[in-house]
Amino acid sequence: MMSFGGADALLGAPFAPLHGGGSLHYALARKGGAGGTRSAAGSSSGFHSWTRTSVSSVSASPSRFRGAGAASSTDSLDTLSNGPEGCMVAVATSRSEKEQLQALNDRFAGYIDKVRQLEAHNRSLEGEAAALRQQQAGRSAMGELYEREVREMRGAVLRLGAARGQLRLEQEHLLEDIAHVRQRLDDEARQREEAEAAARALARFAQEAEAARVDLQKKAQALQEECGYLRRHHQEEVGELLGQIQGSGAAQAQMQAETRDALKCDVTSALREIRAQLEGHAVQSTLQSEEWFRVRLDRLSEAAKVNTDAMRSAQEEITEYRRQLQARTTELEALKSTKDSLERQRSELEDRHQADIASYQEAIQQLDAELRNTKWEMAAQLREYQDLLNVKMALDIEIAAYRKLLEGEECRIGFGPIPFSLPEGLPKIPSVSTHIKVKSEEKIKVVEKSEKETVIVEEQTEETQVTEEVTEEEEKEAKEEEGKEEEGGEEEEAEGGEEETKSPPAEEAASPEKEAKSPVKEEAKSPAEAKSPEKEEAKSPAEVKSPEKAKSPAKEEAKSPPEAKSPEKEEAKSPAEVKSPEKAKSPAKEEAKSPAEAKSPEKAKSPVKEEAKSPAEAKSPVKEEAKSPAEVKSPEKAKSPTKEEAKSPEKAKSPEKEEAKSPEKAKSPVKAEAKSPEKAKSPVKAEAKSPEKAKSPVKEEAKSPEKAKSPVKEEAKSPEKAKSPVKEEAKTPEKAKSPVKEEAKSPEKAKSPEKAKTLDVKSPEAKTPAKEEARSPADKFPEKAKSPVKEEVKSPEKAKSPLKEDAKAPEKEIPKKEEVKSPVKEEEKPQEVKVKEPPKKAEEEKAPATPKTEEKKDSKKEEAPKKEAPKPKVEEKKEPAVEKPKESKVEAKKEEAEDKKKVPTPEKEAPAKVEVKEDAKPKEKTEVAKKEPDDAKAKEPSKPAEKKEAAPEKKDTKEEKAKKPEEKPKTEAKAKEDDKTLSKEPSKPKAEKAEKSSSTDQKDSKPPEKATEDKAAKGK
């Protein structure tokens, strides 16, 4: 709750609400004295009521608030002369404002609590994820143990199978031996049978012989019996004869004796003959039978021998065949067994493989489901977080407005820490202040309208309609903004003069941190915002999901102007704001951007990066590194910001150019493509592409997916790139912590793009990463030119990814491009500014004539990059030598002084225009008719401003050489301070949030602070 200590003791001087239409714009004056408390410096404001550590940030903020409240202080001076009738109204407004601030602070505290709850929830989710990973690791370890045991068992099975095969072979050999023995047994049995058959034959022969012998014996016996009979008969006859002889006489006895002798001789001889015949027959028959049997036996034995030989040979063949058959069968069985084992192994492996595949697929499905769930949760949380951030930014804007008014009143009355003196240009102030208030009110209202209307436009319009409307609107818008920027320039000069008189030294000394941090945040945001158009066109899954978004890149471009344009305002407000009609659109537009981002679907993705990076990159690079991988993983960002950074030197510029789509922007695609090592392989191709891009963002979107492919390779090459841009952006506070450095940054960046462009034009394929490393750090930061060794030590990832440094240098070229895109076309390319400034000035003088002449100049300047392609080499040599001189304070101040003259207040006018363009397209067309006269005015003052710029650049180099040695110790001391602040930041999250919210104040107060420094430089 902001303390308005002396509310009842207000000065008697009259206070009336300024410009009755705006409730936020009022003037407060309070008594000076010991009793009066200072609302911004000493009080615990509601903005910081939620943190105890915010006292330091609040105490460091008077100069911020003073700078931010310049307009309100001048307005309050104007209202002092209105008379006493407005005093009571001022008291009432102060009380109502107290109540409003209390309500806002309560809401803000609620949002902060919600953010903390979400952070606690995120931490719990991270713990659960870690536990799940550990469980998975445990399961994988058990799986390895089981696999080891299974492998051992499989080895044992294989060994047993081999042993079984050997045993089978041995068994087969034994079976062969058994068969051989059996065969021998069969042979022996056969031989025995043959012998038995022979024995039987001989037995039969013996029987036959025995039978023959029996017959012969019988015959012999019969013959012997016959012989005995004959003998008896003969004896009987002889007895008879002898009896007769004896009986008959001697004669007769003699005669009988003679006859008997004769008979006896005949019988004996006959017997002898018979016996001889029988013996002969018997011998002959025996001999014949013996001979016959002998012949027959010989024949049979010969036949038996032949048969046995044949049988033996056949048996040998049979045995041989049997052996071969057995060998084959054993081999076949062994092969069958091996085949069976292999088939079993194969089936087991297949089963295992199928089981593994099924388990892996299940795991993949589970992980996919978890990933989708986590992505959805992350997206929801990011959206909630973005909503909170958007609300916070809106509150910051309101509170910053309050602070500006309060600080302005304090400074005006003389309660500020620095004495107050009226500037010379006060007579102009009253009209200016009323304009400012009207525009600030318009900003807030238009932001709210634009958020809703852009969403509706996205859903309803189609691609072709949107592209045509956006091109027409942007061309008209460019003309309107040119006119309004000139008016804003006068207002800003008046404010700057007033601010300079109040506190030139105090603002430089008291807010180095603010100024340093705000450019850091601006730079940090600028890459993210430069990326966002690319993401919206090519990568954001939101486009893939919603056909309306994919169909209407023009809408995305219409929405992304606040994002893509904010880097130009933030990084180099001084030159960029006047020169780029649509893109140098002031921190006010940046503030308005946050609510617009809340509802636009693309901004729901990119703003998370923009605003999450803006605090984190400025204050905690560790958080940024943590966030950048998250961005890489998040489905919305599909492909890491690193990719987008690496490829977006061109893309970040081309979407910006497309958004404007005026003839002036036909140049800038040429540059973007000439610079990109991926896109622009020749400036001719770049020129060929530029009309297509100027005509249709659809083509741009078609090209962006091609760009999206190459970054994937870049991501594969440098996984550290996702972190290195964050680190580089996070280290920017170390390299630019003083207002001097901040101011030096904008001009040096204006010139560093020259080097980056010449490098890219020379070598579209990034000839040597070493040179790019040496040059791009020098281009990006003044201190890098002095100590590249420190830079490489701090960011080894920078050395590893020269692509990123190239990507960063082009990001800083964005402000330069914006300058180029301006209707005046002061600096189409820095190299052209140096080499061909006289012809450009001639072209610029012709510029206000007609937009047709501007288009002709665009085509000429598109051809200019081709002619100047050899020249960049010469310029590159000159620029590294000139870069260190550029770092000095004098050059920074002079360039900013020039920029201030060129850049009045496009800041406040621009956002209203941008969002009106997005919301109400018919309104813009009506405004075109009104504001075309302003067009010429905006162009005319920018001519002298451009001529001035060439001369100071030459002076700056000499002055900066003299002041190099002085700057180096300062930069080193500030780098150390930055390291300390970074180390303290983790312990002070609340202070960081306070500083984040105060970044808007820093952005608003930047122009008046620069104006004071410009005057100091002129005084020197």
UniProtKB/Swiss-Prot annotation:
* Biased composition range(s): Acidic residues: 459-475, 483-498
Residue numbers carrying Phosphothreonine: T768
Chief subcellular site? Answer: cytoplasm
sequence repeats (start-end):
525-530, 531-536, 539-544, 545-550, 559-564, 573-578, 579-584, 593-598, 599-604, 613-618, 627-632, 633-638, 639-644, 647-652, 661-666, 667-672, 675-680, 681-686, 689-694, 695-700, 703-708, 709-714, 717-722, 723-728, 737-742, 745-750, 762-767, 786-791, 794-799, 821-826
Enumerate the residue ranges of region (Coil 1B).
146-244
Compositionally biased, Basic and acidic residues: which spans?
511-1020
Which disease appears in this protein's record? Amyotrophic lateral sclerosis: A neurodegenerative disorder affecting upper motor neurons in the brain and lower motor neurons in the brain stem and spinal cord, resulting in fatal paralysis. Sensory abnormalities are absent. The pathologic hallmarks of the disease include pallor of the corticospinal tract due to loss of motor neurons, presence of ubiquitin-positive inclusions within surviving motor neurons, and deposition of pathologic aggregates. The etiology of amyotrophic lateral sclerosis is likely to be multifactorial, involving both genetic and environmental factors. Charcot-Marie-Tooth disease, axonal, type 2CC: An axonal form of Charcot-Marie-Tooth disease, a disorder of the peripheral nervous system, characterized by progressive weakness and atrophy, initially of the peroneal muscles and later of the distal muscles of the arms. Charcot-Marie-Tooth disease is classified in two main groups on the basis of electrophysiologic properties and histopathology: primary peripheral demyelinating neuropathies (designated CMT1 when they are dominantly inherited) and primary peripheral axonal neuropathies (CMT2).
Descriptive protein name: Neurofilament heavy polypeptide
Recorded source organism is Homo sapiens (Human)
